[in-house]
């Protein structure tokens, strides 16, 4: 079989993920997000650096969700998501428990990151926090998910 394959192109750089698809199409596994951040994918980094957002982390093993927000106070979406890649929990109480009991490999295998709503840097942080609360209430993530507050 191998002798029938033809090499058409050799890439000048190693493949490091897809191009930025637009905020409404972001749905990334932990390893995809990690690759984007560690390789400093310019299209992605530029898009996330100055963006505020309400985002969703989904545990695909059990369907539990965590709703969070990225505001100026916490360094926008790139900084917020970089925190999750660094330790698996980003400082969140319930996510810390998962990393503590199941390990970082669990997060790497089962966590998925997406954007529910995105905003430019000028949007008032208080509005974003209100939208975060609305999503928590709508998705019942305090009762059935990983949100503590």
Predicted regions and their residues:
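Conserved short loop/helix modules at catalytic or binding sites
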Residues: 73-121
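A generic secondary-structure signal
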Residues: 43, 101-102, 138
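Short solvent-exposed strand/turn elements
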Residues: 1, 85-88, 136-144
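Domain-level recognition of nuclease-like catalytic cores that cleave nucleotide substrates
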Residues: 122-141
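Long, charge-rich alpha-helical interaction segments
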Residues: 109, 145-147
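Intrinsically disordered, low-complexity acidic/polar segments
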Residues: 64-66, 77, 122-124
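GIY-YIG nuclease catalytic motif and its immediate N-terminal context
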Residues: 1-67, 71
